[in-house]
Swiss-Prot record:
Gene Ontology annotations of biological process type: methylation; negative regulation of brassinosteroid mediated signaling pathway
Organism: Arabidopsis thaliana
Membrane topology category: Peripheral membrane protein
One Pfam family matching this protein: LCM
Keyword S-adenosyl-L-methionine belongs to the record: yes
Identification of the protein by name: Leucine carboxyl methyltransferase 1 homolog
Length: 332
């Protein structure tokens, strides 16, 4: 019955909303992204609260990713983006001189075909992939030395394994796994299976999760209704409705340690103070009550497997404080 509240095409369309929101932020000066405009057909101007909310999400993601890329002594690292949509992070990292050894993006074929077409038709993107790159719009894939875009249904774990193998991911390398508003649209069993598979597959890894929480209060009820009216049911939210439940999702499925903060705390205590001062001057902002409620209903969770011992200083607090550890990881 839950599936009837979720429409695959509608969930994929949230990707267009995300790109439009990102472009709105870029145009207002919240952040730099020279490529997102290539994926937006009809630019829209978002409200200040949406712009600030999207900025806080982006800032937390980029700060944690930067920590990952700077961890340890080896420069050989890889990034795996689950449900990548039209994200342009790889191209931004190249411009910053921080491109990983391999960046793999996975999504439904309907999405990867559209993204492959944009890359094919844009020299701004295509030229960054190198002379050996091959692009197939029909197959929905892009293959290059350091970047791969591939189609897969994430719920199909055997196919997910095959795609990772096809992408030539090195399972021994430190890996940053991204899932932004992805797992929560899947049924709970599929979400757990992906978290469990990723833990078993990558022994030195960080999993970055961004999604909704607290469906049971008035704001949460309205959030759920709004999404369901668009065919975008959050099928997994009742299985992990709180910060503690988000942490348990990872700890119960093989990850060594995990921490979840709501976005109000992330913005207040983790996003760079100078950056906050800068963006808070960009637009008139008076929606403080709604801002607090909205930010309390989204969270960042990160989980860590640290076989190489390089992530001791990784995280919100940078000294490992406040993290929950699995019983096996905390045993002597």
């Amino acid at each position: 019955m839950a599936e009837s509240r979720s429409n695959r095409a509608a969930v994929q369309a949230t990707n267009d909303d995300a790109s439009a929101s990102k472009l709105s932020c870029v145009k207002k000066g919240y952040m730099k992204d020279d490529y997102v405009h290539l994926f937006v057909k009809r630019p829209v101007r978002r409200s200040p609260i949406i712009n600030r909310g999207y900025f806080s999400r982006w800032a937390a993601f980029r700060k944690l990713m930067s920590q990952f890329l700077l961890s340890g002594t080896s420069s050989k690292k890889q990034i795996l983006s689950l449900g990548a949509g039209f994200d342009t992070t790889y191209f931004q990292l190249l411009d910053e001189g921080n491109g990983p050894n391999l960046y793999v993006e996975l999504d439904f074929k309907e999405v990867t075909s559209k993204k492959a077409a944009v890359i094919q038709n844009s020299s701004q993107l295509r030229d960054k992939l190198g002379a050996n790159a091959s692009i197939s719009i029909d197959e929905g894939q892009v293959l290059s030395d350091h970047y791969k875009l591939l189609p897969v249904d994430l719920r199909d774990i055997p196919k997910l394994r095959d795609v990772i193998s096809f992408a030539d991911m090195d399972l021994s390398l430190p890996t940053f796994i991204i899932a932004e508003c992805v797992l929560i649209y899947l049924d709970p069993d599929s979400s757990r299976a992906i978290v469990n598979w990723s833990s078993k597959t990558f022994s030195t890894a960080v999993f970055f999760l961004y999604e909704q929480i607290h469906p049971d209060d008035a704001f949460g009820h309205q959030m759920i209704r709004n999404l369901e009216s668009r065919g975008c049911a959050l099928l997994s939210i009742d299985a992990s409705p709180t910060l503690l439940a988000k942490e348990r999702l990872f700890l119960d499925n093989g990850w060594q340690r995990a921490v979840a903060w709501d976005m109000l705390k992330v913005y207040g205590s983790f996003v760079d103070t100078q950056e906050k001062r800068r963006i808070e001057r960009l637009e008139l902002f008076d929606e403080f009550e709604e801002w607090h409620m909205m930010q309390e209903h989204y969270c960042v969770t990160y989980a860590v497997n640290d076989a190489m011992g390089i992530f001791g200083d990784f995280g919100f607090t940078r000294e490992g404080g406040g993290e929950r550890m699995s019983s096996s990881a905390s045993s002597p």
